């Protein structure tokens, strides 16, 4: 396929491109059409657009780009690209201040998060969702299952399969770029879950709602049973399906168990069905997991799901650190992305405790960006190591302004420097005149150094 694809690549100017009739980014890629989104991504990543086309056609890269999201600045997720990060926000029953959530949106955009997921789960969410899509250049994701109860003002068990599908279409019409759909939790997976006891059962919010719906109605998962209808909707609007992991582990005890792996196998089968319809796929993954299991899990996903992009929550590597789960998550995320994860969902210090505030959100974004960048260095992503090398040069030269400009959080770096002023400017208050960098620079230049005298010679 690769060779035939290379032979079929051809380019169109903008006028000619607009005449082309393609349904999705994957459809365009298979036909050798260069979309404006592909051009944007090639420029951002600094790679040949031919490589983007090849990977999108195979499914190893996804471009979440709803036809109705007009403010989108497209990003690619997958093989050979920078590791992307997602920020979760949204309205809950206990915290339903729309303006406060919109402030979080602005913060996420300012901090250059590539994706924002609206996880609103209370009331009529469409107004907030539409405002989010209108103002955001970041790709937008949702979980339609969360919205169903408020959308219909019905109890969960009374919502029909058709109504659940209608919620998906509503989100698609609104311009959502990717949707988490828990299509892998079928009746077979439910029976495996029942036979294999867990410490923490099902911790996925959408997965638990879907499990409850299936049990209360004694029916098959509607997203699995009617997956072709889901594909119809996603093909129409070019929505990327983020196949949700309802059985992701909620504790390190439950990781890599029968329920998790069974669902992952089903997600692989659904991936092939989606690609046959030119619908793009991202696979969602764990979760809570000990360090020694992460590499294996990344390789399993790539094998069982045919190298589809992998989107992970953490993984959180220990369960004992509430208030610090941005750290437990960043540790796991760096390892996961090194071994194949393409997309990291941020975790904040508020995880497991409350809805995050703006400060929590910033801490979570920075921690996740550090994890993503560390993995990109290890993976050899273009430009990743150069950023660190520039910082090292600035440190050697004791160029504080350059260091601040290069810092992943320059605001915090400037604040720390300002709050603790050294005796001499070419040092900091940790070492003062004993600064190794300062003294080596002087000696290497043939100069004398002093530690006790007030002035240098």
UniProtKB/Swiss-Prot annotation:
GO CC terms: cytosol
Residues annotated as binding substrate: 88, 117, 146, 182, 204-206, 245-248, 284, 311
Cofactor: [4Fe-4S] cluster
Any coiled-coil regions, as ranges: none
EC number: 4.1.99.17
GO biological process, one term: thiamine diphosphate biosynthetic process
Disulfide bonding pattern of the chain: none
Amino acids binding [4Fe-4S] cluster: 428, 431, 435
Record text on cofactor binding: Binds 1 [4Fe-4S] cluster per subunit. The cluster is coordinated with 3 cysteines and an exchangeable S-adenosyl-L-methionine.
Pathway(s) annotated for this protein in UniProt: Cofactor biosynthesis; thiamine diphosphate biosynthesis
Keyword annotations: 4Fe-4S, Iron, Iron-sulfur, Lyase, Metal-binding, S-adenosyl-L-methionine, Thiamine biosynthesis, Zinc
Keyword Iron: yes
Top-level EC class as recorded in UniProt: lyase
Binding site for Zn(2+): 288, 352
HAMAP family xrefs: ThiC
Function per UniProt: Catalyzes the synthesis of the hydroxymethylpyrimidine phosphate (HMP-P) moiety of thiamine from aminoimidazole ribotide (AIR) in a radical S-adenosyl-L-methionine (SAM)-dependent reaction.
NCBIfam families associated with the record: PRK13352.1 (NF009895), thiC (TIGR00190)
Family: Belongs to the ThiC family.
Protein name as catalogued: Phosphomethylpyrimidine synthase
Organism the protein comes from: Clostridium tetani (strain Massachusetts / E88)
Name of the gene this protein is made from: thiC
């Amino acid at each position: 396929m690769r060779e035939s694809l290379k032979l079929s690549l051809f380019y169109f100017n903008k006028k000619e491109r607009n005449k082309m009739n393609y349904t999705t980014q994957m459809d365009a890629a298979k036909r050798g059409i260069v979309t404006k989104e592909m051009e944007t991504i090639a420029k951002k990543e600094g790679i040949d657009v031919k490589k983007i086309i090849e990977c999108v056609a195979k499914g190893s890269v996804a471009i979440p780009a709803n036809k109705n999201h007009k403010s989108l600045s497209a990003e690619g997720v997958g093989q050979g690209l920078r590791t992307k990060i997602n920020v979760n926000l949204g309205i809950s029953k206990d915290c339903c201040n729309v303006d406060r959530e919109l402030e979080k949106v602005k913060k996420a955009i300012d901090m250059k998060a590539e994706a924002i997921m609206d996880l609103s789960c209370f009331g009529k969410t469409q107004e907030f969702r539409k405002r989010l899509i209108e103002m955001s250049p970041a790709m937008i994701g949702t979980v339609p299952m969360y919205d169903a109860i408020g959308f219909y003002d019905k109890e969960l068990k009374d919502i029909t399969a058709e109504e659940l599908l209608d919620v998906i279409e509503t989100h698609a019409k609104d311009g959502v770029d990717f949707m988490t759909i828990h299509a892998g939790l079928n009746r077979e997976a439910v029976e495996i879950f029942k036979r294999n006891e867990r410490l923490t059962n099902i911790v996925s919010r959408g997965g638990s709602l879907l499990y409850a719906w299936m049990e209360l109605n004694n029916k098959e998962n509607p997203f699995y049973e009617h997956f072709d209808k889901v594909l119809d909707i996603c093909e129409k609007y070019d929505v990327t399906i983020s196949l949700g992991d309802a059985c992701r582990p909620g504790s390190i005890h439950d990781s890599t168990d029968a329920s998790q792996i069974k669902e992952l196998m089903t997600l692989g089968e659904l991936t092939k069905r989606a690609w046959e319809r030119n619908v793009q796929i991202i696979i969602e993954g764990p979760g809570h997991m000990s360090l020694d299991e992460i590499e294996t899990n990344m390789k399993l996903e790539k094998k069982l799901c045919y190298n589809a992009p992998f989107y992970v929550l953490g993984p959180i590597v220990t369960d004992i650190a509430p208030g610090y789960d941005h750290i437990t998550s960043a540790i796991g995320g760096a390892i996961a992305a090194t071994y194949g994860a393409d997309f990291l969902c941020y975790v904040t210090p508020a995880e497991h405790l409350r809805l995050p505030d703006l400060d929590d959100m910033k801490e979570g974004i920075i921690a996740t960006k550090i994890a993503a960048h560390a993995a990109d260095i290890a993976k050899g992503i273009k430009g990743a190591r150069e950023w660190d090398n520039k910082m090292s040069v600035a440190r050697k030269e004791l160029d504080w302004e350059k260091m601040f400009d290069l810092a992943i959080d320059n605001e915090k770096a400037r604040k720390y420097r300002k709050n603790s002023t050294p005796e001499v400017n070419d040092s900091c208050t940790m070492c003062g005149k004993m600064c190794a960098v300062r003294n080596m620079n002087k000696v290497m230049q043939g100069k004398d150094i002093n530690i006790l005298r007030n002035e240098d010679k």
